[in-house]
Amino acid sequence: IPKRSGAKVKSIITYNFDDLIEESLSKVKLEYKTIYRDEEQHDSDELPIYHVHGFIPGRESFDREASLVFSEEAYHKVYSEPYHWSNLVQLATLRENNCLMIGLSLSDPNLRRLLEIAAQKQSKNCRHYAFIQRLSNDSLIDDSSCVKINEASVNKILQTHHIIQEKMMESLGTRVIWFEDYSEIPVLLDEIRK
């Protein structure tokens, strides 16, 4: 990740509560600002890291006032408030930038809703990309099962599933980048960066 002036990465939005991203950025001495509530602001030389479901930092800087979206009820409250800061940040980012989504199943209804809204209003230059792990017949066929499934049938079903997934994501302005093993992600990121 380049330094902030001329940075290609404008922000990071995470749905995780932990501070693992911050720990990694500290190791490479990149300035960042953790944002997990409405009143937080960042300087132009800081990479904003938005924790849209809340934040639990390491013990040394634990904030007892931080709100977390743990329960389904709390999630629905955020989801139903269109002007909640986390929805506004996500929507603005999705509308104005090319986004790369890693580690998401993209089954979250609020994220899909925001992607759909952004796809309707975004410029034609904005595209989003999502790394999604390709399902394999190995993950679906259990050799110890007494029920035998035809491998060719499973492959056909998976192929159809992947095509449907791609079309569905395309309607949300997002192109799927398939991977089979997590070790492929750094290589794919290097290819994208070039």
Predicted regions and their residues:
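Active-site micro-motifs of SAM-dependent methyltransferase domains
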Residues: 19
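Active-site glycine-rich loop that binds ribose-phosphate moieties when present
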Residues: 34, 69-88
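Active-site-proximal helix-loop elements at catalytic-domain edges
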Residues: 53-76
